[in-house]
């Protein structure tokens, strides 16, 4: 799969928004300005009138053009006919808006509540004291009559994926489900056409701050942590196509005295040769991109064990390098990674005492509680995700449906299967915050510039997003009252910290 990584030139802050809130400016209501950043980075380079990020995905799709939906002009969220229809609908909505709840909205709310009750009853019928497989079967038949993956309201589409997950558990397939074999990811194993996966990734970038929030927070912290270093070594747990690092390279290259950057990506032998080949191709493209910037750069990979655990002995270290561990976990576009694999990576970080450890993770409920309790928490979480996408792009139904089908649907099915298989606890865990503290890591404070950057990012999206500072070292992305994902900063750089 060819990819022109030359086209990733910025952090995708173009100074405008296609969404519903006010565009960000030099002085917005967050009290942040693009012109007031740490001198470590030339942020002006990231706020020009560039829109090259999309060329990356476009070029990847062009090289894999097999003709599925969204393949001809990816990120085009609708066809010309749909745009005309949407323009008409928008006009009608504008002229008929009232402050009262319409009968249609009331009906949707009633149906949504009914679906929630049916889903909860279905979950209860599959486990616990009230387990009744025949009742579960009847409930699922009724749910299938009421929902659709492609039509209807947000709640109806969401319920369709949860119904699919419950059906898999009832039939026994879900209990043995392994999301790494079904989750549709860029550059990874999947059952969707590659063009659909690439298109969905670009659309997810356009529709929400989920991916950018983690990348930008981690990158800003890294730049600050290595400001005066001559050599930097980043160990990346799940590099995918390397999109995160192109923007960091540009930040480092903007400093005349910037450091040499080395990235070690982990490859997974358990997935076969494809994983290693993908990592090597990512390294080739990142190397070419660094050369185009004049950024000193080298790339290596380290293979995980067959059980996906990490052994630090396989890591090549050079004296004088500032070591950074980067860990992106279970975001919508990423493959699920087991807690044992993640723990082995973080344990290695503890042994090697890096300058900084960045952890970006999905915010889920506690790993405690039974299946029904965690089922409802998952329903609440994904309801917030679906709502946030619709609020940002209310008219682009086909685009949202693609993101839901490629990323969110498989994530729902896989997550519920793991919860069910472990009886509600165990493998599917909550935040890594307590684990890191118990292991001896200490938090690294999030800088005011980093927090300000997050607020500016959210200014490009719908007003329902907000960022919360949790403690001094963690930023949490919210949709309204629901936590979606977080970015936290850690270190274990001294013997006393890691004892």
UniProtKB/Swiss-Prot annotation:
* Keyword hit for Transcription regulation: yes
Q: Quote the subcellular location field of this record.
A: Nucleus membrane; Endoplasmic reticulum
| Keyword Signal tagged | no
GO CC aspect terms = endoplasmic reticulum; nuclear membrane; nucleus
Region Leucine repeat II (LRII): list its residue ranges.
281-313
Low complexity compositional bias: what residue ranges? Answer: 88-104
Domain GRAS, first and last residues per copy: 106-491
Protein name from the UniProt record: Protein NODULATION SIGNALING PATHWAY 2
